[in-house]
């Protein structure tokens, strides 16, 4: 990477790290829990530690279709014949003991009969009637899942603050746990501001544009599993802004807006925000997304995002999402970031971190590489739609040449 003079440096800007620290310092997890059935617990935040009430598996079981035998009957050389004395099915075990010279037909998941400790795959025996012949080369204990091998009674299984994923739901079911205690859902009110904005279903008038940010925010918030309060489009006048903010403060834990409110570029908006709460109007040393507003309206956390669509998404991912996750009580996690070669040149001036939109994919040689989506304007929402990652270029970085390694953050790791 070529490092240039910092001609883009703004001495009044906050770094992303400092802004995150200030936000984190002012946040507290919400209070409130509820008991839900595990069918309704997907993507909820666990509010209790889960300990296994049973051993998993609860008994020694076969991992293969085959024959359950005694390890002492395994030949070290040559062959041995064993008599089949019964069958152990999954859910219907064979209950008689197996002794030397005997074996039992067994199926995957079935309980190991008393006396047996080894399973021979059905493809590795010769069967004639009720006798099998097996050769040397097998290991005592092979193809058997032992009692408690996965989980043992009273073992800590899931910790409070974990976001429950599909595998966790299955795990809870395997333990016989029908319900769990989870954090209540975070209530988030959101709206867009601007006289130029038109809601879907309305006819565009001269100078108007469709309100894309509110639908983007809806989708981003929906994936986080919060309770959303969509307050629509708020017009650019002091009374409308104040009414919307006060209404949101009565019904929500967090308010998120996009547009003029975030920048404080209109005097009445700035005064309204400051009169209603404690608000900081920040310039962040980042691109896109330089303006960010954060603070409190009454006792409710407030985030004001830029009006440009890409800027709104980038600031949501980098600031709002981790803040909401903390307030939800979710354990802190760091998004995956990896270094890969960049196969297209990137323009950048030092002075602020940039989150350029990229496409991460294997090249013809199977290498994982990244390329730009093209033009990086903060109003070009199509660049976010085409991308599957951010290309993160640090503050002191200048232009990037082809094959230079860059840091990328896959969108999939942000969810």
Q: What spans do the regions from the language model cover?
A:
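Structural signal for hydrophobic packing residues in well-ordered secondary-structure cores
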Residues: 24-31, 49, 112, 155, ...
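Short, glycine/charged-enriched hinge/interface segments at domain edges or termini
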Residues: 2-14, 67-230, 235, 369, ...
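Short, low-complexity N-terminal leaders and the immediately following helix N-cap/first helix
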Residues: 1-77, 330-355
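Flexible glycine/proline-rich
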Residues: 20, 34-39, 48, 91, ...
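Helix-rich terminal scaffold detector
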Residues: 1-17, 178-305, 309-315
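Generic structural signal for well-ordered, non-membrane alpha-helical segments
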Residues: 12-20, 34, 38, 60, ...
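Short, hydrophobic/aliphatic alpha-helical segments
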Residues: 41-55, 93-105, 294-295, 299-301
């Amino acid at each position: 990477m070529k490092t240039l003079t910092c001609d883009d440096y703004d001495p009044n800007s906050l770094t992303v790290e400092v802004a995150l620290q200030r936000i984190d310092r002012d946040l507290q997890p919400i209070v409130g829990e509820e008991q839900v059935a595990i069918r309704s617990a997907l993507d909820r935040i666990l509010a209790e530690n889960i300990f296994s009430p049973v051993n998993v598996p609860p008994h020694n079981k076969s991992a293969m279709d085959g024959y359950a035998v005694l390890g002492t009957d395994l030949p070290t050389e040559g062959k041995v014949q064993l008599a089949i004395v019964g069958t152990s099915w999954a859910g219907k075990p064979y209950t008689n003991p197996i002794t030397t010279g005997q074996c039992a037909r067994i199926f995957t998941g079935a309980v190991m009969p008393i006396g047996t400790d080894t399973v021979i795959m059905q493809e590795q025996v010769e069967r004639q009637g009720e006798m099998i012949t097996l050769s040397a080369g097998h290991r005592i204990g092979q193809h058997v899942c032992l009692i408690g091998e996965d989980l043992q009674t009273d073992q800590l299984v899931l910790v409070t603050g974990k976001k429950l994923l599909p595998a966790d739901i299955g795990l809870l079911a395997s333990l016989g746990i029908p319900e769990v205690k989870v954090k209540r859902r975070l209530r988030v009110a959101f709206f867009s501001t601007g006289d130029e904005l038109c809601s879907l279903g309305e006819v565009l008038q001269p100078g108007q544009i469709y309100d894309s940010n509110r639908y983007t925010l809806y989708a981003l918030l929906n994936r986080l599993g919060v309770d959303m309060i969509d307050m629509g489009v708020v017009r650019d006048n002091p009374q409308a802004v104040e009414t919307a903010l006060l209404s949101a403060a009565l019904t929500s834990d967090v308010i998120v807006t996009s547009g003029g409110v975030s920048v404080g570029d209109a005097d009445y908006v700035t005064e309204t925000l400051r009169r209603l709460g404690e608000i900081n109007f920040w310039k962040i040393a980042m691109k896109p997304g330089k303006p960010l507003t954060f603070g409190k309206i009454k006792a409710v956390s407030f985030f004001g995002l830029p009006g440009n669509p890409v800027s709104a998404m980038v600031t949501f991912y980098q600031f709002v999402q981790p803040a909401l996750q903390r307030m939800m009580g979710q354990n802190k996690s760091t998004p995956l970031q990896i270094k890969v070669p960049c196969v297209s040149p990137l323009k950048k001036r030092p002075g602020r971190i940039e989150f350029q939109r990229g496409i991460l994919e294997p090249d013809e040689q199977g290498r994982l590489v990244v390329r730009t989506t093209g033009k990086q304007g903060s109003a070009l929402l199509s660049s976010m739609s085409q991308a599957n990652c951010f290309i993160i270029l640090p503050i002191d970085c200048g232009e990037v040449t082809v094959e230079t390694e860059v840091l990328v953050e896959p969108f999939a790791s942000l969810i």
